[in-house]
Curated annotation (Swiss-Prot):
The lineage of its organism: Eukaryota, Metazoa, Chordata, Craniata, Vertebrata. The keyword Transmembrane applies. One of its GO terms (biological process) is ubiquinone biosynthetic process. InterPro entries: HB_polyprenyltransferase-like, Prenyltransferase, UbiA_prenyltransferase, UbiA_prenylTrfase_CS, UbiA_sf. Its cofactor is Mg(2+). Residues 1-45 form a transit peptide. This is 4-hydroxybenzoate polyprenyltransferase, mitochondrial. It is found in: Mitochondrion inner membrane. The chain crosses the membrane at residues 84-104, 109-129, 172-192, 201-221, 232-252, 278-298, 301-321, 333-353. HAMAP family: UbiA (MF_01635). GO terms for molecular function: 4-hydroxybenzoate polyprenyltransferase activity. Its EC number is 2.5.1.39. Residues 105-108, 193-200, 253-277, 322-332 are mitochondrial intermembrane.
Length: 371
């Protein structure tokens, strides 16, 4: 009897103690939540942080992600989150504009800015056309399944209207040039619209891309000079085509398994394990053509120094390339922006040195005449 009463008393005390503890814990949790709410109400992001406390980023992808949500699919359709393609389209234009500058002068900054704007618009238009043609294929490839048209974020009709807007703005840029350049620029539209079809009918779609992407090598010179100089523009155009065959073959190795399954063609599937041999051949052809450009345009030592640096970069790129690792292919592909910038820098510095060499030659002639 006493044992049962004692046990009941113990159980009662235990129950009261647990109730008190849980009540205290509940009050403590309430205080903690209240403190958190007060902190959240008064919290302000520190410098370098976004609204959610994450580090701010000025990368193209971060800028697109911070844009109003309805605009984001259209910005991604233009590939503004991946600007490497715009750079690769723009850089041959800068080479041509730089080569067309008068000896001792910097390139025409107005033309550089005009062509930069045109590169953004035409690359966006080209990507829109490409995604419209390839929407059914893109759904079957892991890397491209999230593209706006393939994912259903933008309808075919809206993408067509958006394409019209981009081409209209690009036409406005083109009309700022001389008549020769307007006609030359308009001629590139055939290449822009047909390139996306090439991967269905030939193993050389990268060649078609090279013909399209390097049109600025012709257009930049004509925009400055009024017409093309074949001795400079044609080898420059050829070198750009070889360059595109290099970087886009590397790029194509990212999707070679999916492409083989769905029946698309590329130089990556054509060259297979011989890819590095082909890339080496394209590199030699590219450097040879750029050397001819230098001779025909009277380039000076900085230009040829830049070509040596480009050769070293290409050799390292090809030697270290792992064609079976998509991450490495993307890294090597994007590094080609550096190659384009080195060539542009070599052209600018080489052109600035032309005036010094001309002055030295003039002084030597005058000294000989005096003697």
């Amino acid at each position: 009897m006493l044992g049962s009463c004692g046990a009941g008393l113990v159980r009662g005390l235990r129950a009261e103690t647990q109730a008190w503890l849980w009540g205290t814990r509940g009050r403590s949790l309430a205080l903690v939540h209240a403190a958190r709410g007060l902190h959240a109400a008064n919290w302000q992001p520190s410098p370098g942080q976004g609204p959610r406390g994450r580090p701010l980023s000025l990368s193209a992808a971060a800028v697109v992600n911070s844009a109003p949500r309805p605009l984001q699919p259209y910005l991604r359709l233009m590939r503004l989150d991946k600007p490497i393609g715009t750079w690769l389209l723009y850089l041959p234009c800068t080479w041509s504009i730089g080569l067309a500058a008068d000896p001792g002068c910097l390139p025409d900054w107005y033309m550089l800015s005009l062509f930069g704007t045109g590169a953004v618009l035409m690359r966006g238009a080209g990507c829109t056309i490409n995604d419209m043609w390839d929407r059914d294929y893109d759904k079957k490839v892991t890397r491209t399944a999230s593209r706006p048209i393939a994912a259903g974020d933008i309808s075919t009709f809206r993408s067509f209207v958006f394409l019209g807007g981009q081409l209209t703005l690009a036409l406005g840029v083109l009309l700022c040039l001389n008549y020769y350049s307007i006609a030359l620029g308009a001629a590139s539209l055939l290449l822009v619209t047909t390139y996306p079809l090439m991967k269905r009918i030939t193993y050389w779609p990268q060649l078609a891309l090279g013909l399209t992407f390097n049109w600025g090598a012709l257009l930049g010179w004509s925009a400055v000079k009024g017409s093309c100089d074949p001795s400079v523009c044609l080898p420059l155009y050829f070198s750009g085509i070889m360059w595109t065959l290099i970087y886009d073959t590397i790029y194509a190795h990212q999707d070679k398994k999916d492409d083989a399954l769905i029946g698309l063609k590329s130089t990556a599937l054509l060259f297979r394990e011989d890819t590095k041999k082909w890339l080496s051949g394209f590199s030699v052809a590219m450097l040879g053509a750029l050397s001819l450009v230098g001779v025909n345009s009277g380039q000076t030592m900085p230009y040829y120094t830049a070509l040596a640096a480009v050769g070293a970069h290409l050799a390292h790129q090809i030697y270290t390339l792992d064609i079976n690792r998509p991450e490495d292919c993307w890294e090597k592909f994007t590094s080609n922006r550096t190659i384009g910038l080195i060539i542009f820098l070599g052209i600018v510095l080489g052109n600035l040195c032309k005036a010094k060499e001309t002055d030295k030659t003039r002084k030597n002639i005058e000294n000989r005449m005096e003697n």
